Amino acid sequence: MRVTLSDTALRHIALFEDVTGASAVDCLVDDDRVCFLVATGEMSDAIGPDGTTVEQVEERLDKRVSLVENADTAELFVANALAPAVVHNVTISENASTVAYAEVDRADTGVAIGRDGETIETARRLAERQFDIDDIELA
């Protein structure tokens, strides 16, 4: 699926790549937060030692930054998007709409949902943009 990025998102990606040396595939910009979809295998570069690199990005943008690692399959992508929650299995159901059902430990349900639902909402937005998944439900 082809994703269209706003000028703001493109500027944020350029800054992110300049500071971290990692590649960003997509970017979601909210009022107080930016989420970067990091190229597969480049998450350690994006985070940096003890999180110092991503902290530099947060300081430069004056916003909280979250990172999601890209994946080749929709199932792994959904699991990555819900991290740090432990996801045991993801099943994709294609009926009237495409829904990803993610099996998460009961103890990690709150982590997968995130504060005010922001983790699962970000996962839903990215999954729709990258894999045409209409919804993510926790099982």
From Swiss-Prot:
GO molecular function: RNA binding
InterPro entries: KH_dom-like_a/b, KH_dom_NusA-like, KH_sf_prok-type, NusA_arc, NusA_bac
GO cellular component, one term: cytosol
Biological processes, Gene Ontology terms: DNA-templated transcription termination; transcription antitermination
Subcellular location: Cytoplasm
Residue intervals of the KH domain: 97-139
Keyword terms of this UniProt record: Cytoplasm, RNA-binding, Transcription, Transcription regulation, Transcription termination
Organism superkingdom: Archaea
NCBIfam families with a match to the protein in the record: nusA_arch
Role summary: Participates in transcription termination.
Family: Belongs to the NusA family.
HAMAP family associated with the record: NusA_A
Protein name: Probable transcription termination protein NusA
Organism: Halococcus morrhuae
Species classification: Archaea, Methanobacteriati, Methanobacteriota, Stenosarchaea group, Halobacteria
Gene name for this UniProt entry: nusA
